[in-house]
Swiss-Prot record:
Name used for this protein in its record: Mitogen-activated protein kinase kinase kinase mom-4
Cofactor: Mg(2+)
Catalytic activity reported: L-seryl-[protein] + ATP = O-phospho-L-seryl-[protein] + ADP + H(+); L-threonyl-[protein] + ATP = O-phospho-L-threonyl-[protein] + ADP + H(+)
Location of the active site: 178 (proton acceptor)
Gene3D superfamilies: Transferase(Phosphotransferase) domain 1
Organism whose genome encodes this protein: Caenorhabditis briggsae
GO molecular-function terms, A-Z: ATP binding; MAP kinase kinase kinase activity; metal ion binding; protein kinase activity; protein serine kinase activity
Protein's gene: mom-4
Compositionally skewed regions (Polar residues) per UniProt: 352-369, 396-411
Family listed: Belongs to the protein kinase superfamily. STE Ser/Thr protein kinase family. MAP kinase kinase kinase subfamily.
Domain Protein kinase: 53-308
Disulphide bonds in the chain: none
Length: 545
């Protein structure tokens, strides 16, 4: 496929420059939100005759606009090829243009969706024309197309492709901030993966404390609104790696968005354990470590996945269709889903309104692998549990494992490939034990957490689910959660004051009895003193007589 872009500059920008007065000189460039993101590069505008509007049809519609499948050609002398056009609503046009600038700057990378240019349509307004990925998203493959079998070789290949793209961002001091399965598009019969959706992409010199991203893959420090860096993308890689191996949802889908975020940020909630090779589990656990310093870098991830891809080299073998026992074919074009686009649907938990009734129990995924086929292990799934795992119950454990005839030395090399030289194996996802002298503080913290979770379950106090790509929505969500935390502090203080009051009232009769005894003692001492005084007087009178 020919992907060379237009070199023709924007006609509108040319006309603007010819009629605009010369700008006043400035002393220093002002850093804006787009600083460092291809500010000097012009994205070509695609003329109308290069788009086949008669054969365009809608793929999806969301809050931010619509996506259409169309046909695109470089010029009248070229053949049409499949393409996608992403149109934006007027209020999100700036985000779309900014995303286009990022994609244009990264267009040479083989694992980043390619952009052909900007296109203005009379019906939908400004849009971005990009290559069409005919196999949908990784999320659709993992969750919706369970009849398609893939192997650990394919997982290694996909993760290598993702790490290669992420390493390119990080080398340029840039962060994606919303890595997830929905933003990983597939083509070439599911074997080639490309990243898309750069609406939250930013440069590292910006102040990064806003909680942007998707809740399932959002790093703890992002939700805590702490300063974060490229290591937030590494956390997302760890969750994505788990999803590919387990082929299941990492958390209970009945868990509310605030409850999920709060538990991830404060209680070190992570996806359930999988019975898989430690070569894999050790690495994705290191990626989602609560301490960003303990996570590997993108370069170390790329090194690890390169070694994994070398160990499992059959990633180019066609995926198998379990229904036909034949290599999988390219799926038919997707149809419009009124509920919204996959990439614009927000968190993927619940609806866009109030969160559903919160549940703090997790469904345990059950990853099972079939027998080894062609030196690879096919990933399949048992049916999901029909009910949440209640406290005290033991969910069915994973029975399969990624195991192969590998030597211990090879396994050690793979395990160490992506691990930083200074990093050590981190503990499991369980919270560390509480010191004995800190149990009172721990009890107070647990009580505060319980109050906070109760606020998240209450219809009057729980926040509306945030829109992952809307800065105002995320800010409102964060402010609401912060207010709930402050409210929880106030309720806990009130509870402690009432507890102290009740304790004082319960001890009040004892206090009154104690006061009465003291008064009685004082009275008796005075009477004894009087008797002694009178006794002394009688003795002196007797002596005189």
């Amino acid at each position: 496929m020919d992907t060379s872009p237009h070199s023709k500059p924007s006609s509108s920008s040319a006309s603007q420059s010819s009629h605009s007065p010369s700008p006043a000189p400035v002393t220093a460039p002002r850093k804006t939100r787009d600083s460092g993101l291809c500010m000097t590069q012009d994205i070509p505008e695609i003329p109308t005759h290069c788009i086949d509007n008669l054969n365009s049809h809608q793929l999806g519609r969301g809050t931010y606009g619509i996506v259409e499948k169309t046909r695109y050609r470089r010029s009248r002398n070229h053949e049409y090829r499949p393409a996608a056009i992403k149109y934006s609503s007027p209020i999100h046009l700036a985000t779309l243009i900014r995303e286009a600038k990022v994609m244009w700057a990264l267009r040479d990378h083989s694992n980043i969706i390619k952009i052909y240019g900007l296109y203005r349509d009379a019906r939908h307004g400004q849009g971005v024309v990009m290559e069409y990925m005919d196999c949908g998203s990784m999320s659709e493959l993992i969750y919706d197309r369970k009849s398609i079998d893939y192997t650990i070789d394919h997982v290694a290949s996909w993760l290598y492709q993702m790490a290669s793209a992420v390493n390119t961002f990080h080398r340029n001091d840039q962060v994606h901030r919303d890595l997830k399965l929905q933003n990983m598009l597939l083509c070439d019969r599911y074997r080639t993966m490309k990243l898309c959706d750069f609406g939250t992409f930013t440069a590292m010199h910006q102040s990064m404390t806003s909680n942007r991203g998707t809740p399932i893959t959002m790093a703890p420090e992002v939700f805590r609104c702490e300063e974060y860096n490229q290591k937030s993308d590494i956390y997302s890689i760890g969750i994505i790696m788990w999803q590919m191996i387990a082929r299941n949802h990492p958390y209970n889908r009945n868990l509310s968005v605030p409850g999920l975020l709060y538990n991830v940020a404060t209680a070190s909630l992570r996806p359930p354990e999988l019975d898989c090779n430690p070569i894999l589990s050790d690495f994705y656990k290191q990626c989602w470590h609560d301490d960003p310093v303990s996570r590997p870098t993108a370069a170390e991830c790329l090194q690890y996945f390169t070694a994994l891809k070398t160990e499992y080299p059959n990633g180019n073998v066609p995926l198998a269709d379990a229904n036909t026992n034949r290599p999988v074919e390219t799926p038919p074009p997707r149809v419009h889903r009124p509920s919204g686009l996959g990439s614009a649907s927000g968190s993927g938990l619940g609806t866009n309104g109030r969160t559903p009734t919160a549940s703090n129990h997790l469904n345990a995924p059950q990853a099972v692998n079939t027998h080894r086929r062609n030196r690879s292990e096919t990933i399949q799934m048992k049916p999901e549990l029909p009910y949440p795992v209640m406290p005290g119950e033991v969910a069915a454990s994973s029975s399969g494992a990624f195991r192969g005839p590998r030597s211990q030395s090879e396994a050690k090399n793979l395990r160490d490939a992506g691990r930083s030289q200074s990093g050590q194996r981190h503990p499991h996802r369980n919270a560390p034990p509480i010191p004995i002298d800190d149990r009172r503080d721990s009890n107070e913290s647990n009580e505060k957490d319980a109050i906070f979770m109760e606020l998240l379950r209450n219809d009057d106090t729980r926040p509306v689910d945030p829109d992952a790509r809307d800065e105002a929505s995320l800010d409102i969500f964060h402010q609401h959660c912060s207010s709930n935390k402050e409210y929880a502090d106030a309720l806990l203080l009130k509870k402690e004051v009432l507890r102290a009051k009740h304790e004082l009232l319960s001890r009040w009769p004892q206090h009154q009895r104690h006061v009465e005894l003291l008064e009685r003692q004082n009275y008796l001492e005075q009477e004894i003193a009087k008797l002694e005084y009178n006794s002394d007087d009688d003795f002196s009178i007797t002596e005189r007589l």
